[in-house]
Amino acid sequence: MNKETYKKMTGFLHSHPTQAKIVITTNKIITYAIYLAYPCLLLWLIFHNGAATLLEGRIDPLLSKAILVPAVSFIAVSLFRALIDAPRPYEAFALPPVIAKDTKGKSFPSRHAFSIFVIGVTFLAACPLPLVGWLILALGVCLAVVRVLAGVHFPRDVAAGALLGIACGCLGFWIV
């Protein structure tokens, strides 16, 4: 994305408050919904098969993976992005984002995109309703688009976050 594209995209939203509000609200709703859904999955795993194994002094392997895969991956991605410390579009182009944000750097990869995609894969692996996992992955695409439209990430940031989230989830659940 170049400065002109960024300026047109965010400029349109800045001059159309209703559309800007839709972008901001969509970002919040998807983010909060997923961060609410994930603990619900963990609780379901605890009460469905984890409680019996805990009483026996063991930990259910699926519950362990559902906790450890996203957690370890999240920490690794956070360290990686702090090391890379890529500027955000609003820093690079000195233009205001649509979503109020003043974070400096740490744009690549997008942690929002990473998180929703690794959680989507976690649902695919651990939830008895695979449709929920696919829905979360579809919401991940929406969130990635919203983060770019809002001017807080470059397309490469959300693409890398999505790919890393899927890769870490698949690696953690089906390969390791």
State the predicted function of each range:
Residues P97-V176:
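Membrane-embedded catalytic cores of phosphoryl/pyrophosphoryl-handling enzymes
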Residues L43-A52, A126-C127, W174-I175:
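Structural signal for the C-terminal ends of transmembrane alpha-helices
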Residues K65-S73, V77, G161, G165, ...:
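Alpha-helical transmembrane segments in multi-pass membrane proteins
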Residues I34, L55-V72, R111:
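Generic, well-ordered alpha-helical segments
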Residues T18, R58-L62, P89-Y90, P128-G133, ...:
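Membrane-helix interface segments
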Residues I30-I46, V72, L135-A138, L143:
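Hydrophobic alpha-helical transmembrane segments
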Residues H16, Y32, P70, F74, ...:
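Residues at alpha-helix boundaries and the short loops/turns that link adjacent helices
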Residues M1-P39, G50-L54, P61, V77-G105:
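N-terminal transmembrane-helix/juxtamembrane module of multi-pass inner/ER membrane proteins
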